[in-house]
């Protein structure tokens, strides 16, 4: 959240900048808008929202209060400090209690989807881009246009959408922190997982991870003569 408020980039293998290990309420106050947007998005589905504040030993009481207030102001049903790393299960008791309460008070009829499957592929992508990411629109490459047309003609137009984009920003630009405005989602191609039953647009500069290596580990899993599973590790 401090990074979303303008904090320095975090680089793998390097110590965290001081603002992340020392109290900095100014950066945090600026960055909680990102959390509030996530809460707003979750509430679109009609579900209870519980925010887990994962406590680090460097977090201060003032910072924890800022996060909790921002979450509640945005409509979260609760925002609970969780200190399970230091205290084990007991440290997560408050969070667990809040989750149980939310489940008990949740009505199944309240749940709703963001879009109807019957919408066109482009309409579903636009719905996600505008309502979840806050984009002004969507730009489709020529390749994406051709792929969408082919999927629609092949009977895959009603499949749900799983967006593949950077996790560091609501936009396709990983450096655009907070809740960016005035941007468009760029779809450079659209791939299909017909067996699993969804389409996934590739947005901006993002690489996908293969689901299995060239030689998957299941080749080594077997049963020995006593019926024990071997080869898992």
Give the positions of each predicted feature.
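P-loop NTP-binding site
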Residues: 1-233
């Amino acid at each position: 959240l401090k990074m979303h408020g303008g904090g320095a980039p975090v680089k793998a293998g390097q110590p965290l900048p001081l603002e992340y290990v020392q109290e900095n309420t100014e950066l945090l106050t600026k960055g909680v808008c990102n959390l509030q947007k996530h809460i707003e998005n979750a509430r679109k589905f009609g579900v209870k929202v519980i925010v887990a504040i994962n406590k680090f030993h460097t977090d201060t009481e003032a910072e924890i209060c800022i996060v909790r207030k921002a979450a509640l102001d945005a409509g979260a049903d609760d925002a609970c400090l969780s200190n399970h790393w230091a205290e084990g299960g007991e440290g997560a008791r408050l969070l667990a209690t809040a989750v149980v309460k939310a489940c008990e008070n949740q009505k199944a009829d309240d749940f709703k989807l963001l879009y109807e499957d019957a919408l066109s592929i482009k309409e579903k992508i636009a719905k996600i881009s505008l309502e979840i990411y806050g984009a002004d629109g969507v730009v489709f490459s020529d390749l994406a246009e051709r792929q969408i047309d082919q999927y629609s003609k092949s009977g895959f137009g009603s499949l749900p959408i799983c967006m593949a984009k950077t996790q560091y920003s609501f936009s396709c630009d990983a450096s655009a922190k907070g809740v960016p405005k005035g941007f468009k989602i760029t779809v450079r191609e659209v791939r299909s997982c017909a067996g699993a039953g969804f389409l996934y647009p590739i947005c901006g500069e993002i690489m996908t991870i293969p689901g299995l290596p060239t030689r998957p580990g299941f080749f080594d899993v077997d049963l020995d003569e006593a019926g024990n599973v071997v080869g898992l590790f």
